[in-house]
Design a protein with these regions (language model features):
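Active-site beta-loop-alpha junctions enriched in small/polar residues
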Residues: 18-20, 50-52, 77-83, 106-110, ...
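Distinct, well-ordered alpha-helical segments
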Residues: 57-61, 92, 172-186, 202-210, ...
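Hydrophobic faces of well-ordered beta-strands that scaffold small-molecule active sites
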Residues: 11-17, 45-47, 75-78, 103-105, ...
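Short acidic/histidine-rich active-site segments
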Residues: 246-263
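Mid-to-C-terminal alpha-helical segments outside catalytic/metal-binding sites
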Residues: 264-298
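Extended substrate/RNA-proximal surfaces in nucleic-acid metabolism proteins
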Residues: 85-192
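Active-site mouth loops of central-metabolism enzymes
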Residues: 13-28, 76-86, 141-146
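An N-terminally biased module of ancient metal coordination in phosphate/nucleic-acid-related enzymes
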Residues: 1-72
Length: 298
């Protein structure tokens, strides 16, 4: 089985790695993540922070050799939470023009995330290592019920850069409104993050987003019993893949947190279990290699 897993992961792309630096505790930095990914045969990874643009992190580390040689390429992006000014077109413009590949709409700052965590106080989301001002809700809707004017400006920048628009942790109605506007503006690459975690999407929601051209990303940390984010067994992941189709699905680790499995270890574990369940190698490879690569490639 180990050889089969290694073969499937050869050329894999992880669009969802959480390294240091971060105000949330992390066990690896981008250099560590790249080294681990290279040892597992990965082609590329994207590093993410809920609090700052990781694009400049990647550029700074590139001066010391990151992205040199045959190892995996490392890319960054920006998440539109309070620390970067929320729906800030200038932050997006900077991140994309400096080489960023993903813009995550609000994650920890989305009203959905804030409400979900208030309703589930025992949810094991990482605790801040430094005391920050409380996250302010970053809503894409204005008082008139329509999208705020900053949203199309941000989407235009994403379209111009041919970058990835990611849902973040928004509610289904917000994702639909943003993705519909994105399609009209010309955004070609769209990704929904962990639809059943915080977002609380249905299969019908996901099918709607797929009809707009989006891929559905499932976070492996949700299905790994060694992870603090473990919420569902493998049956749930398989059901989602069967409902939406492997051709519209991607797998990302969503890992890097202290005390959680390493990203590549979780990939090996969950990929092995999917293969052991009888999922065709071609379908698994499509979700870990082909689909995320197609989204990421400039």
């Amino acid at each position: 089985m180990a050889d089969r897993v290694a073969s499937v992961l050869d050329g894999a792309v992880d669009l969802h790695v959480h390294p240091a630096p971060s105000p949330l505790p992390r066990r690896i930095d981008a250099v560590d993540a790249a080294q681990l990914a290279g040892e597992a045969g990965f082609e590329a990874i994207v590093v993410k922070s809920h609090h700052h643009s990781t694009v400049t992190d990647v550029l700074a580390l590139a001066r010391d050799g990151l992205n040199d040689g045959p190892g995996p390429r490392v890319y960054g992006g920006v998440a539109l939470n309070s620390a970067v000014g929320g729906l800030n077109p200038h932050a997006v413009d900077l991140a994309l023009k400096m080489g960023g590949r993903i813009v995550w709409f609000p994650t920890v700052g989305s009203p959905q995330h804030i409400a979900h965590h208030r309703a589930h106080p025992n949810l094991k989301f990482p605790k801040l290592a430094v005391q920050l001002q409380p996250e302010e809700p970053v809503d894409v809707f204005g008082e008139d019920g329509g999208l705020k004017p900053e949203v199309p400006r941000i989407l235009e920048s994403i379209a111009e850069a041919d970058a990835i628009l990611a849902s973040g942790h928004m509610a289904p109605a917000s994702i639909t409104a943003v993705f519909e506007a994105a399609r009209e503006i010309g955004v070609r690459r769209m990704l929904v993050n962990h639809p059943n975690f915080v977002i609380e999407a249905s299969y019908e929601d996901a099918r709607r987003w797929v009809s707009l051209g989006a891929a559905i990303e499932h976070s492996l940390c949700m299905y790994d019993e060694e992870s603090s984010f473990h919420n569902w067994d493998l049956d749930t992941l398989v059901q989602w893949i069967e409902a939406i189709g492997a051709e519209h699905s991607t797998l990302g680790s969503d890992l890097g947190q202290t005390s959680n499995p390493l990203p590549t270890d979780s990939f090996r574990k969950i990929v092995g279990r999917l293969l052991d369940r009888g999922m065709p190698e071609g379908d698994v490879r499509r979700m870990v290699c082909d689909n995320p690569r197609r989204l990421l490639e400039p």
